[in-house]
A protein has these predicted regions:
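A conserved regulatory-domain signal marking ACT and ACT-like small-molecule sensing domains
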Residues: 309-403
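Rossmann-like NAD(P)H-binding beta-loop-alpha module
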Residues: 68, 115-196, 203
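N-terminal glycine-/serine-/threonine-rich beta1-alpha1-beta2 phosphate-ribose binding loop
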Residues: 1-91
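Catalytic, metal-anchored helix/loop core of enzyme active sites in primary metabolism
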Residues: 146-150, 158-161, 165, 177, ...
Length: 403
């Protein structure tokens, strides 16, 4: 029998317990031994819930129990998740987590600690909820040089942008609706300002490129400045607006960014709507591949966590997950990153054509969408070149990158 302890009985923790209990025959069969949840750690009481029988309030009860083989961390945040995880690994216990903050900040250290003690630290659910993208990068795509990762990695913001697109609603209205439905937190800052996908693209890039990407180095822009008027232009162009976490590995170096993009129907992420996530990966041999599914939610995320539990159950006394190098990735300076841009501007295309062309080169103009303004799409420019041009165009209303 393999005993599991779950740290935290919130949405994901309770989902892990449910998946293991409901699908126990399948989970245990795939693990090669019976999987049992022996403990759940939480400060709260859960009267009337069967979990009350295995509930403990002191982490030492778990870490000192030699029968506990695997610990599942679902508390979120860095502290005390970091301290509990490190202590568990040092005690020779395997740990898996859905905690992107923990992995983005401390992933290399915790994987190294796991290796030192002959156990594993896994985090499949930290980036794509139920989408098995990390295992694919670690196992299936090991023959490829990964050239690009681009993804819709946050269900909350994808829901908001999808609703703004389909209903023509403004940002604040759709955000409140998302909060009322439980898709967005009361404090939605991590989602709408892009901090959540920033950590996720940092983790995926570290896995794919084999070196540490610091999320603090990633240029990050949220969706709070996207308006219903922006979608009027997108519809005219047959495009949609999505927020991407993206990184590229080219001969010039590695770049990374989180920002809204306007994309056409030919983009494989165009059809990823509502709360779903999609992650595009390009390898130098495989070419393009797509991972699609529920990027959040109780049971989809718990399913990915339990996948790690099963993997660790098969390798209880050996370290199988690869460790990326502690060498920090020095990102291409933001001003040198290349993008194309959609721009909204006051005035008319006829009167502004010469000035716009002088500042940005050849562009495609879009007129007749909103009275008193026009739009245009640039060719590929560096961020620095575009910013210099934008300073000289006070009539500019907004800009959104295109892909």
């Amino acid at each position: 029998m393999i005993n599991v302890a779950v740290l935290g009985y919130g949405t994901i923790g309770s989902g892990v317990v449910e998946v293991i209990n409901r699908n126990n025959a399948v989970v245990s069969g795939n693990a090669g031994d019976e999987i049992r949840v022996k403990y759940v750690l939480d400060l709260r009481e859960f009267e009337g819930d069967p979990v009350q029988k295995i509930l403990v309030h002191d982490f030492n009860t778990i870490v000192s129990d030699d029968e506990v083989d695997i610990i599942v961390e679902t508390m979120g945040g860095i502290h005390p998740a970091y301290e509990f995880t490190k202590q568990a690994l040092e005690a020779g216990k395997n740990v898996c987590t859905s905690n992107k903050e923990l992995v983005a900040a401390c992933g290399y250290e915790l994987m190294s600690t796991a290796k030192e003690h002959g156990v594993n630290f896994m985090f499949e659910a930290s980036c794509g909820g139920g989408i098995p993208v990390i295992r694919a990068l670690y196992n299936s795509l090991t023959g490829d040089v990964i050239e690009e990762i681009t993804g819709i990695m946050n269900g909350t913001t994808n829901y908001i942008l999808s609703k703004m697109d389909s209903e023509g609603a403004d940002f604040d209205t759709v955000l409140k609706e998302a909060q009322d439905k439980g898709y967005a937190e009361r404090n939605p800052e991590a989602d709408i300002e892009g901090y959540d996908p920033c950590r996720k693209i940092a983790i995926l890039s570290s896995v794919a490129y084999g070196r540490q990407m610091d999320y603090n180095d990633i240029y990050t822009e949220g969706i709070t400045k996207i308006t219903a008027d922006d979608f009027k232009y997108a519809k005219k162009l047959g495009m949609r607006i999505k927020i991407f976490g993206t990184s590229s590995n080219t001969a010039d170096g590695i770049s990374a960014m989180v920002a809204p993009y306007m994309i056409g129907a030919e983009n494989p992420l165009y059809g990823v709507i509502d709360v779903f996530n999609g992650i595009f990966v390009k390898g130098n041999m495989l070419g393009d591949s797509m991972f699609y599914g529920s990027g959040a939610g109780k049971l989809p995320t718990a399913s990915a966590v339990v996948g790690d539990v099963v993997d660790m159950a098969r390798h209880l006394h050996e370290t199988v997950n690869r460790i990326w190098s502690p060498e920090k990735i020095e990102l291409i300076p933001h001003e040198n990153v290349k993008n194309s841009f959609f721009v909204r501007c006051k005035g008319t295309a006829a009167e502004m054509k010469e000035r716009v062309t002088e500042l940005f080169g050849d562009v495609t103009f879009i007129d007749g969408v909103i009275d008193g303004e026009f739009g245009f799409i640039t060719g590929t420019l560096t961020e620095g070149r575009f910013a210099e041009g934008a300073k000289k165009l006070p009539e500019m209303i907004t800009r959104i990158r295109t892909k």
